[in-house]
Amino acid sequence: MTHLQAGLSPETLEKARLELNENPDTLHQDIQEVRDMVITRPDIGFLRTDDAFILRFLRARKFHHFEAFRLLAQYFEYRQQNLDMFKSFKATDPGIKQALKDGFPGGLANLDHYGRKILVLFAANWDQSRYTLVDILRAILLSLEAMIEDPELQVNGFVLIIDWSNFTFKQASKLTPSMLRLAIEGLQDSFPARFGGIHFVNQPWYIHALYTVIRPFLKEKTRKRIFLHGNNLNSLHQLIHPEILPSEFGGMLPPYDMGTWARTLLDHEYDDDSEYNVDSYSMPVNEVDKELSPKSMKRSQSVVDPTALKRMDKSEEENMQPLLSLD
């Protein structure tokens, strides 16, 4: 076992070996294989390439080097293309803070029987007058950044339960194509988390309709892990034991305290340690080629082309028409 695996229990170490192809004897070599690919994408600013960071992506892609690198590249590319989302990427940002306080997301105290963290969302809690859907997405991404620092969760992953009770048609009409695309790209395509299940409960017909629209844009693996339970909580309990669920999901525990996870982040004033802004990319363009040469590349060094960091042109964005019209 290397120091990079020090945070794993013996059971999780064995799981990483069997399910993720993680081998302590080749771990540093695996990490370096991914790091060496950085020079193939000079258009992307890789703000972190240290061992522990790259290891998250290897675990998320079962130690397939190219797939891990592609996820790493998409992670930073997503942030470059959506700079405004990450300008004030911290728990004390007003929009993120309010979303967190309303339980976007929540995190249950107990892990499931596979050692996965259970995230919960109560969709109707969204207060449209105080924060946006983008703020909710930012709060979720920030929370995942904090949680994924736990090596146990890098291996075991997460499950998500979304309760759609009392989520109105008016709220659903705000889910525009561009908003849904932003969420899919940020969570499915650009983050090193393993999601073992996404469970919808108490969803109305218009959420079924929305899911039908976005389903073709989901990866096959993602589609297989989405469960639409409706009002049948027994089917949820077959996959997540009621002993660890709050009463809102027919569980045996007290009602969930929406502010639990918010207090955790705010107590630590958690923020992402990377500033995603144009000013932070200060390497002169004429030095990029020199810095990208294999001889000058160091372990854990990242090289940035400042010309790659541009906001998406408004004309390139999808239209903001709602998928569900109130007319």
Swiss-Prot record:
GO cellular component: clathrin-coated vesicle; early endosome membrane; endosome; trans-Golgi network
InterPro entries: CRAL-TRIO_dom (IPR001251), CRAL-TRIO_dom_sf (IPR036865), CRAL/TRIO_N_dom (IPR011074), CRAL/TRIO_N_dom_sf (IPR036273)
Principal subcellular localisation of the protein: Golgi
Its membrane topology: Peripheral membrane protein
Tissues expressed in: Expressed in brain with no expression detected in non-neuronal tissues (at protein level).
Segments forming domain CRAL-TRIO: 96-257
Subunit relationships: Forms a complex with clathrin heavy chain and gamma-adaptin.
Written domain comment of the UniProt record: The CRAL-TRIO domain is required for targeting to the membrane and for binding PtdIns(3,5)P2.
Name under which the protein is recorded: Clavesin-2
Species this protein is from: Rattus norvegicus
Gene (UniProt): Clvs2
